[in-house]
Amino acid sequence: MADIRITGRMVNFSRITFDTNDHDVIRQQLSNILNEGSYQGTVVIIDSTVEQELIALIQLLVSMGLQPMAVIDGILGDEARAIQFPVLPADQPLQRIKPTAEQVAIVEKPTSAQASVETKKPLNNNAVAHITSYHDEILRTGQSLVQDQGDIILKAGMNSGSEVIASGNIHIYGTVRGRVIAGAGGHAAARIFCQSLEAELVSIAGTYCVADDIPKHVVKKPVHIYLNEKQELEFEALEL
C-alpha cells in the first residue's frame, strides 16, 4: 500500500485583497469584518495592490485567528518566494458586466424575523438593502457578474471562463460551464440552483469543489447545491 494518498480538493478559504500597508488600519478594518461573520480559523489567500512587509502581515493575520495559505503572484510574489511561502498564479482579468436589471428590497437584519418589504424610505439602523440582479443573456467567456448585496438570477447559461459571484443565492436557468460562487463573504446558508451543471468550480461561503470532484451523478443534470451541517458541499439532483 502506498504511504501517500491524494484525496478530495475541497477546503474552506477566503481571499483577502489589501489596498493599504498600514497594519493599524488593516487590524481595525479586519476586526470589523471578522466580527460580522464566522471567519475564525479560515484559510486565507493574500492579495495586495501595494507593497507589504509580508512576514509582519502574515503574523498579523495569524494573531487575528486566520490561517494564511499563500499569496497571489504580483507585488508580493518575490518576497513570498524569498521566504518559501506559497505563491499562486495571478488571475486572468475578467470584464465585470452590469446585470440586465436589479430589484432592491429593504430587509430587516438577520436578527429580526420581519419579512422583506420594498420601500423608498431611507435605511434605518435595523434594515439593509437586499439586491437581486437579473441577467437575460448568456455570460460569455471572460465576463464576470457580481452582486455583493444579494442574489443573482441568470435567465440563460454561462460559458467556460466566465464567473458569477453573489453574497446570497445563485439561480441559473441554463447550462453552467464557468465558476459559480455563492455566499461570498461567509453566508453559509446560501444556495446554488442550476438546470445543467458542467461548472469549472462551485463554491459556497468559501467551501469549493473543482470540476473533477463534482459528483458524476449530477453532471449535466438539474442540481441544488448547499452546505450540510458539517459545512461540506451537498449536490442534490433535481427532478424537473
From Swiss-Prot:
GO terms for biological process: cell morphogenesis; division septum assembly; regulation of cell division; regulation of cell septum assembly. The keyword Protease does not apply. It holds the Pfam family MinC_C. InterPro entries: CAP/MinC_C (IPR016098), MinC (IPR013033), MinC_C_sf (IPR036145), MinC_N (IPR007874), Septum_form_inhib_MinC_C (IPR005526). Keywords: Cell cycle, Cell division, Septation. The keyword Cell cycle applies. Belongs to the MinC family. Interacts with MinD and FtsZ. Cell division inhibitor that blocks the formation of polar Z ring septums. Rapidly oscillates between the poles of the cell to destabilize FtsZ filaments that have formed before they mature into polar Z rings. Prevents FtsZ polymerization. NCBIfam families: minC. This is Probable septum site-determining protein MinC. The lineage of its organism: Bacteria, Pseudomonadati, Pseudomonadota, Gammaproteobacteria, Moraxellales.
